[in-house]
Amino acid sequence: MQAILDEFDEYLALQCGRSVHTRRAYLGDLRSLFAFLADRGSSLDALTLSVLRSWLAATAGAGAARTTLARRTSAVKAFTAWAVRRGLLAGDPAARLQVPKARRTLPAVLRQDQALRAMAAAESGAEQGDPLALRDRLIVELLYATGIRVSELCGLDVDDIDTGHRLVRVLGKGNKQRTVPFGQPAADALHAWLVDGRRALVTAESGHALLLGARGRRLDVRQARTAVHQTVAAVDGAPDMGPHGLRHSAATHLLEGGADLRVVQELLGHSSLATTQLYTHVAVARLRAVHERAHPRA
């Protein structure tokens, strides 16, 4: 089974352009399915729609969230379609399997004043010129300024940054490339990092990576999450959040400032406008909360 998983993983990476995070999740889902088959004394050849439904029912019975069920369904549908093309399955048992709709919840976002305080905290922490503090300042500034995903941030190379025009070239989901602008505060953080931070950490293993870990290798997602969590935690009253929370906040603040929905969609790299529209609900919900607190006849 491992050889099959390795080949499927290669297909997801090279032909589908799936991210490392998605591929890891899909392979974990398939290992769960294979273990379920083994417990029943079955093999891949015995995979049927009924078996898949039983597996998903067992997953739900174990307390899995609807988002997990939706992802597992997507994973197995992608796998069985590929397996049919590879001749590993005679027919596609998942063709009629419905992907459950994940219940959308409004993401936690920072208020604009909280976001500014978080950026100020990161800037203050970098005043002594510590390379890691300079890096962490750039992490939060770029994430909030551009709204890019943390995986996209960690994948950036130095050459992806156009400092003169304050633009960053991003390789997003499905290997789709987009260009996102950033403002002067992020440009200042970038300059400080390139001049005083990166040079102190760069090694032969650094390559062209923009952001580096303490040992000079390309920064990983886990380290970036830690930097964001610690920075936001310094802001009184701010919700606990990681990089995706800064992405949510950037999108919400753009819309609150009057940005066009389709422009925000392009900046975030959303393939569907419906995904971006979630942030309009966040903005409206925040306006309603302010109205209810402040208006005498709310």
Swiss-Prot record:
InterPro entries for this protein: CB, DNA_brk_join_enz, Integrase-like_cat_sf, Integrase_catalytic, Integrase_recombinase_N, Integrase_SAM-like_N, Tyrosine_recombinase_XerC/XerD, Tyrosine_recombinase_XerCD
The protein, known as: Tyrosine recombinase XerC
Keyword Cytoplasm in record: yes
Entry similarity comment: Belongs to the 'phage' integrase family. XerC subfamily.
Location within or outside the cell: Cytoplasm
Active site per UniProt: R149, K173, H244, R247, H270, Y279
Subunit structure: Forms a cyclic heterotetrameric complex composed of two molecules of XerC and two molecules of XerD.
Domain Core-binding (CB), chain residue ranges per copy: 1-84
Keywords: Cell cycle, Cell division, Chromosome partition, Cytoplasm, DNA integration, DNA recombination, DNA-binding
One cellular component term from this protein's GO annotations in UniProt: cytoplasm
GO terms of molecular function: DNA binding; site-specific recombinase activity; tyrosine-based site-specific recombinase activity
Matching Pfam families: Phage_int_SAM_1, Phage_integrase
UniProt key word Cell cycle: yes
Record-level GO BP terms: cell division; chromosome segregation; DNA recombination; DNA transposition
Annotated function: Site-specific tyrosine recombinase, which acts by catalyzing the cutting and rejoining of the recombining DNA molecules. The XerC-XerD complex is essential to convert dimers of the bacterial chromosome into monomers to permit their segregation at cell division. It also contributes to the segregational stability of plasmids.
Tyr recombinase domain mapped to chain residues: 105-292
